[in-house]
A protein has these predicted regions:
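Extended Lys/Arg-rich polyanion-binding regions
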Residues: 423-425, 431-448, 456, 466-482, ...
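Intrinsic disorder/low-complexity segments
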Residues: 17-36, 538-615
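Helicase motor core with emphasis on the C-terminal RecA-like subdomain
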Residues: 53-89, 95-98, 102, 108-109, ...
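Hydrophobic positions on the alpha1 helix immediately C-terminal to the Walker A/P-loop
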Residues: 126
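Acidic, low-complexity intrinsically disordered tails
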Residues: 2-23, 28-35, 555, 574-575, ...
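Conserved RNase H-like, two-metal-ion catalytic cores of nucleic-acid enzymes
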Residues: 888-965
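Helicase-associated low-complexity/disordered flanking segments
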Residues: 2-98
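Conserved DEDDh/DEDDy metal-dependent 3′-5′ exonuclease domain
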Residues: 937-1001
Length: 1001
């Protein structure tokens, strides 16, 4: 059964903020940065009062202040040595906080340590002090610092060099990453610094791949520092897990045994995550001794869209000289909020910028520098600025929608209020179920445990991608210590040898890489190859048709030209062109000629940045991964970048380039997909409340079949356009709930729509999944089927959205009872009548949220969670064409049987044993949870005993159903009750001779 599902980035869009409510103009100031008031506390308080009386009036549902906390100074100090203590003193550090002292002490004891304390608590000092103290005693030693983002590297290098400058000896530090010039790389390899700063990507492609050139470092490596540990979660975490297995192998080969030290935001399982990623035993430091300033929270449930409210809050904050950051959940929303905040306010355009993934590196560095220096007072961003990039002290954080996890929420909130500054955090709820859950239950947010981070070592695709790289670095053997406990290692070796990616030695004891550089084929951050979005081509936009594009042969190669963009502060004029005649420029110095056709559609021609010469320049505006290619950059899509609209044209596969042209149109676009699931392998099964929950390998197929043009404002669909795109297929891990026909009959007898009930339950369950584990809303997918072709019964599937899985589905399977309870409480507690975005609507449902049955969803969740029982009459199914037969395989076999002949009755003798006792499941009234260990059946026709294990329970039930008489002892009171945990079949229908009942009677 195929269900239509949407693009994950599809969001509810609306009218931009109305101009009649805009704040007063920004006062004219002298050239240079805007300096915020020193009295931040009073400004934040006044701003909060202003918002309560104006923009947020009557929409604040909860206010809470996290009070300040005093510092806890270490009672004793680790002996770092006089040199390091002098350097710290020169940096203004006269004492250590308690968690810093604890971490340094553990490191000096030789332990591997993970420090998981809140943002801005001085975690970096732990590893900097310990590493410097050690390298002063061992000057031939070296350390490698690994950061997930290049921007974090530069921050760390600046901080390190400040410390190193005060040392009497010549310890050095350098950055080695993709932006490092070739001649600088060569110099670094020849003159190895004491501290090498890099990223996982460069560690993979530039260091491990050429480890012979790094012999000196690998021989003398004493420290491996990994910052921002919590980011190594999900698919990226699974890649990094194998990356460090490879690094550990090489260190052992070169004779070094470095210590690990890692820092993380506060997560629920720092020790477990570190041990899983690095393959070592860790000690965690989690109690912070750093002081904190008061942080005020406002939970806001706006009547209008949170996107427009965010734009007005950004304007209001910047106009009051409060440094304001707005976090959104999607790139398109980032661009829209930025555009709406600046399009009517040219005075604000110089003080606000957008920032997200996909911007060019030099663009991002320029924005970061302007924020740090105070040239910018406001920024709209996705999660790209969530990490510890130094962008100066911020005062106000606006969250446009719940970020998806407690971890990410606190990480984003931690961007404001540094250096003892009082701060304000505003959570603007969307109508999504998870947002509304916290609007109704704010105490659940503030009192909730931090989520666990998940990194799955068992992803077979990622394992098979890394093993050829590992074999190229060092030949692999069957007994690799670093792969001990990695599920599927032996099978992966065999599969890679069969495919020709690995070559097995003649004696069969070693495996070698078939390719010279398999590292080049592995991208740890994206699904598929990266494509460049190139602007500068002409395009005519019709009302419903995609633009005409040049042929692939005639399209020039993009030149390296800085794209037109809104100017940063300090530009000579507002548009950055230096020429007031360019009144048609779109905030970027690129003259735009436009006219309006009879149909009202814009006809736009994008001239080149070098218009004077008459030569058109093509320039790269961003990149997109192969995984997003067909959902974001299909021909005819509207792509937003720095507040400008670009019409996507043709794709050029050989160069991996996508044409784009500047346009100004009153609509946005969203794709439509079809999906289906196929069960490949069952990995686990457990009885629930009259049904089975199973975990297994799935094949998910999706195809973008069309896109819609949707008018901004009233959300009217202007037109639909078919698309031809390839089917995208991947294997993953998921769990599913199998519901026999009585569930359908029960729902229908109670007046509910079967498919609508399943569909609503899938939506609601998927919405609350991030409460179980650290994940984004797009990390899990779902599909429901009223009659799955393989199962021949109704089913709801929840699966990881990445090839091979990332461990989330296993988490959901293990905590299924909790997930169903949370979902039931959320849906039943919603005040709406027929369903809404706060309970069963899903913002990106490709079926337009139809059909949905809220009452049926509640009823079904009550059945699934054991709060209600199936109606006994639901088992007596009428013979209707639309109802599948109960236990279809058995009934078909009966239909195909030859005419009944005179023979003896079919009698079986049956008994079973359970895995758990009554005490272990909570009493004899919960025998359905005791789980089958084995069942034994003697059959008079074959005169044989048959043993059934738990995975064979469906066959056991079929065997019992096929008998004319079942003989057992207490099978009615006990054995059938245990089997009811696996099936909704009414076992009272079986003709049974229960000897215990016969004795009692």
């Amino acid at each position: 059964m195929i269900q239509r599902v949407p693009d994950p980035d599809d969001e509810f869009l609306d009218f931009p903020p109305s101009t009649d409510r805009l704040p007063a103009p920004l006062p004219t100031k002298a050239e240079g940065p805007v300096e915020p008031s020193s009295d931040v506390k009073s400004l934040v308080g006044e701003f909060r009062t202003y918002l309560q009386q104006t923009i947020l009036q009557d929409t604040i549902v909860h206010e809470q202040t996290i009070p300040s906390t005093p510092e806890r100074v270490a009672l004793k100090t680790s002996h770092l040595g006089p040199e390091v203590e002098r350097v710290l003193s020169a940096a203004g550090i006269e004492h250590l906080w308690s968690h810093q002292e604890e971490g340094i002490h553990l490191l000096r004891e030789g332990k591997d340590v993970v420090v998981a304390t809140p943002t801005a608590s001085g975690k970096t000092l732990v590893y900097n002090a310990a590493v410097l103290a050690d390298l002063l005693l061992n000057p031939a030693g070296c350390a490698i610092y690994i950061f997930p983002l290049k921007a974090l590297e530069q921050n760390q290098l600046d901080e390190l060099r400040t410390l190193l400058a005060n040392l009497s000896c010549g310890l050095t530090a350098e950055i080695y990453d993709g932006d490092t010039k070739p001649h600088v790389r060569e110099k670094i390899r020849k003159q190895l610094p004491n501290i090498l700063i890099t990223t996982p990507d460069m560690l993979h492609a530039g260091i491990l791949a050429f480890h012979e050139a790094w012999e000196e470092m690998l021989n003398n490596l004493r420290w491996i520092v990994v910052d921002e540990l919590h980011t190594y979660n999900g698919i990226f975490g699974s890649h990094v897990l194998h990356l460090f297995r490879r690094l550990n192998r090489l260190c052992s080969s070169y004779g070094s045994s470095p210590r690990y030290v890692s820092c993380s935001a506060t997560i629920g399982n720092p020790t477990q995550l570190a041990e899983r990623l690095f393959g070592r035993s860790f000690t965690a430091v989690t109690e912070s001794g750093a002081p904190t300033a008061p942080r005020h929270f406002l939970f806001v449930d706006p009547v209008e869209s949170p996107n427009t409210v965010a734009a007005r809050l950004l304007q209001a904050g910047v106009l009051r000289q409060l440094r304001t950051i707005v976090f959104t959940r999607a790139r398109v929303i980032t661009e829209l909020v930025y555009r709406w905040a600046t399009q009517h306010r040219h005075d604000l355009a110089q003080r606000i910028s957008s920032y997200r993934a996909g911007y060019l590196p030099e663009e991002r560095r320029q924005i970061e520098s302007a924020l740090t220096g105070g040239d910018l007072l406001g920024v709209v961003t996705t999660s790209a600025l969530e990490l510890g990039i130094d962008i100066g002290g911020l005062d106000v954080c606006v969250l446009v929608g719940y970020p998806g996890s407690i971890v990410n929420t606190w990480q984003r909130a931690g961007r404001v209020g540094r250096q003892g500054r009082e701060s304000l955090v505003i959570l603007l709820a969307s109508k999504d179920a998870l947002d509304q859950y916290f609007m109704k239950y704010p105490d659940q947010f503030f009192g909730r445990d931090i989520e666990d981070a998940v990194a799955d070592p068992g992803n077979r695709y990622i394992l098979k991608n890394h093993l050829p790289c590992a074999a190229r670095e060092l030949p692999l053997t069957a007994d690799e210590p670093e792969y001990d406990g990695i599920t599927g290692y032996a099978e992966a070796l065999a599969e890679l040898a069969a495919s020709g990616d690995l070559l097995q030695s003649a004696d069969g004891d070693a495996w070698f890489a078939a390719r010279k550089q398999p590292h080049r084929l592995l991208n740890m951050r994206a699904i598929g190859e990266s494509w460049s979005i190139v602007a500068g081509a002409s395009a005519r936009v019709a009302d419903t048709s995609p633009p005409a594009t040049e042929s692939p042969d005639s399209t020039p190669t993009a030149e390296t030209v800085t794209p037109p963009r809104p100017p940063l502060p300090g530009s000579s004029d507002l548009f950055g062109s230096g020429n007031s005649a360019h009144a048609g420029c779109d905030h970027g110095g690129s003259p735009v000629e436009s006219e309006v056709s009879r149909s009202g559609a814009s006809l736009v021609r994008d001239a080149a940045p070098s218009a004077r010469s008459g030569k058109k320049k093509r320039y790269t505006i961003g990149t997109v991964s192969g995984g997003q290619l067909y959902t974001e950059c299909y021909e005819g899509a509207i792509y937003l970048h720095r507040g400008r609209q670009y019409l996507i044209g043709e794709r050029h596969s050989p160069r991996r380039q996508i044409d784009a042209s500047v346009v100004d149109v009153p609509y946005y676009t969203r794709p439509k997909q079809e999906k289906e699931t196929e069960i490949i392998e069952e990995l686990a099964s457990k009885p629930m409340h009259g049904y089975l929950a199973k975990l297994g390998r799935l094949k998910v197929s999706s195809q973008v079949i069309a896109y819609e043009k949707v008018r901004v404002g009233d959300q009217v669909i202007i037109s639909r356009h078919p698309l031809e795109s390839p089917v995208q297929t991947f294997e993953t891990i998921g769990f599913w709930l199998e519901m026999d026909a009585p569930f359908k009959k029960h729902l229908k007898r109670n007046g509910h729509h079967h498919m609508g009930s399943l569909h609503a339950t899938e939506h609601a369950t998927k919405s609350l999944f991030p409460l179980l584990a650290l994940s984004k809303g797009t990390d899990v997918g779902g599909i429901c089927c009223p009659m799955h072709p393989q199962l021949r019964k109704g089913a709801i599937f929840i699966y990881d959205q990445y090839p091979g899985g990332i461990g989330l589905a296993e988490k959901g399977f293990d905590m299924l009872d909790r997930l169903l309870e949370l979902t039931l409480g959320m849906v039943a507690g919603c005040d709406c009548g027929e369903g809404c975005p706060s309970c069963i609507h899903f913002p990106t449902c490709g079926a337009s949220n139809h059909p949905l049955d809220k009452a049926g969803c509640i009823h079904l969740l009550e059945l699934l969670s054991g709060r209600a029982d199936l109606d006994p009459e639901a088992f007596d199914l009428p013979e209707t064409e639309d109802e599948p037969p109960l236990f279809a395989d058995w009934e078909i076999a009966e239909t195909d049987a030859p005419p009944e002949q005179e023979e003896e009755d079919h009698v079986v003798v049956f008994d079973l044993e359970t895995q758990l006792s009554a005490a272990e499941v909570g009493g004899w009234n919960k025998t359905y949870l005791m789980r089958v260990s084995c069942g034994v059946v003697w059959d008079n026709r074959s005169d044989e005993f048959t043993t059934y294990l738990e995975q064979d329970v469906p066959k056991l039930i079929e065997h019992l159903q096929a008998a004319d008489l079942i003989v057992g002892f207490n099978c009615i009171g006990f054995d059938y009750s245990v089997l009811r945990g696996y099936s909704s079949y009414d076992f009272r229908k079986l003709e049974t001779l229960d000897m215990l009942r016969e004795i009692k009677e």
